[in-house]
């Protein structure tokens, strides 16, 4: 039995407790500074406030953000379950507390734009802060509710040390949670990060179709973006076109970063993009922008919602502009990415240039 400490008790971090507990490991679920209301509820024996599930069947304890030291003491595996906006907090406050040789499994999706104009995946950033700690990361389609409910799920674990990746798989793999392994951390992590960005792009078509029905504000956006909710205007050719363009640009981007572009056709890319478009905060973001709202209006309508897609798009587009100056990339090969950046950062209306899409 291992001690598995999960830092970040939001929905995905909390869901990871299920396979770890089912495998007989002792789980410690610890909150970030934003998670106190979750930890307070769980300590009181209540359901998880956002996952809407009981933890009665999960073996372990709950810790608040000011209880990191006892939560991490003796931990064999630590899950980085924070959002991309919490990466520096994790590096500053959690990594220094880890014993050498601890295995960190990151489920955080995103990319860092560095001062030298490079993009860095989070596991490499963490490793630069603690080279004596082992790191693995997770990519692939995994809806938190379904994992917690033991639905059949297949993902990809990656890392630059296959021994660490296989150890992570041994801790979490179950009869319902199936794990592929890869040493191409760049290919997997870039695909996993970019699918968040491009899920917004595909969702623009949802909002554009709803605009045809006269829906141009945030009415019903939460209910309409729950996975399985019917589309208000079921038009799918535009969504399919944007999905295909997303996969094309993701492959180009992953290869530009030095990863294997084939991952885009697999679990970390197209697989994860598929479920992300079905519902959740990124679908809400893209749908509202497609309805004709500006990004400023959308941020107000979705106040309190973490919009990781916006951060990834902004960083990726800026990376492409900087890479163009050095002759390493051509933003014209990423028309959907650059259009999404214009929508977010120049308040441009959602109006995809369909004739700019396509190619191989």
PLM feature segments, named:
Residues 1-54, 60-64, 72, 93, ...:
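NAD(P)+-binding Rossmann beta1-loop-alpha1 motif at the extreme N-terminus of oxidoreductases
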Residues 8, 31, 106-108, 139, ...:
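Short beta-strand/turn micro-motifs composed of small residues
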Residues 10, 14, 36, 62-65, ...:
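Electropositive phosphate-/nucleotide-binding environments in soluble metabolic enzymes
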Residues 62, 68-152, 168-170:
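Rossmann-like NAD(P)(H) cofactor-binding subdomain of soluble oxidoreductases
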Residues 97, 128-134, 152-262:
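Internal alpha-helical scaffold of NAD(P)-dependent oxidoreductase catalytic cores
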Residues 106, 134-139, 179-183, 265, ...:
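General beta-strand structural signal in soluble alpha/beta enzymes
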Residues 195, 200-206, 210, 217-234, ...:
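NAD(P)-dependent Rossmann-like dehydrogenase/reductase catalytic/cofactor-binding core
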């Amino acid at each position: 039995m291992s001690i598995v400490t999960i830092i970040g008790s939001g929905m995905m971090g909390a869901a990871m407790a299920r396979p770890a507990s089912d495998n007989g490991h002792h789980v410690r679920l610890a909150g970030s500074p934003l998670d106190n209301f979750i930890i307070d509820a769980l300590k009181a024996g209540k359901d998880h406030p956002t996952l809407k599930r009981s933890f009665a069947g999960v073996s372990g304890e709950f810790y608040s953000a000011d209880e990191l030291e006892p939560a991490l003491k003796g931990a064999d595996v630590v899950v980085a379950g924070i959002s991309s906006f919490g990466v520096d907090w994790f590096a500053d406050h959690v990594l220094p507390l880890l014993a050498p040789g601890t295995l960190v499994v990151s489920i955080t999706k995103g990319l860092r734009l560095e001062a030298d104009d490079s993009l860095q995946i989070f596991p490499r950033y963490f490793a630069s802060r603690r080279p004596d700690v082992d790191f693995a990361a997770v990519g692939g389609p995994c809806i938190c509710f379904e994992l917690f409910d033991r639905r059949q799920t297949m993902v990809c674990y990656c890392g630059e040390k296959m021994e660490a990746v296989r150890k992570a798989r041994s801790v979490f793999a179950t009869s319902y949670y199936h794990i592929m392994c890869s040493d191409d951390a760049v290919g997997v992590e870039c695909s996993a990060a970019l699918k968040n960005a491009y899920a917004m792009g595909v969702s623009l078509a949802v909002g554009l179709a709803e605009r045809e029905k006269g829906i141009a504000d945030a009415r019903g956006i939460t209910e309409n973006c729950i996975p399985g909710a019917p589309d208000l205007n079921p038009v799918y050719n535009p969504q399919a076109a944007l999905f295909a363009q997303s996969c094309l640009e993701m492959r180009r981007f992953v290869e530009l970063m030095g990863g294997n572009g084939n991952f885009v056709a697999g679990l970390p890319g197209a697989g994860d993009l598929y479920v992300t478009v079905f519902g959740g905060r990124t679908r809400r973001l893209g749908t509202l922008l497609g309805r004709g709202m500006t990004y400023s209006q959308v941020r107000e309508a979705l106040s309190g919602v973490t919009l990781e897609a916006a951060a990834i798009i902004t960083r990726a587009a800026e990376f492409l502009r900087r890479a163009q100056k050095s002759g390493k990339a051509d933003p014209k090969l990423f028309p959907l990415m650059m259009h999404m950046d214009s929508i977010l950062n120049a308040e441009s209306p959602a109006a995809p240039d369909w004739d700019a899409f396509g190619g191989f």
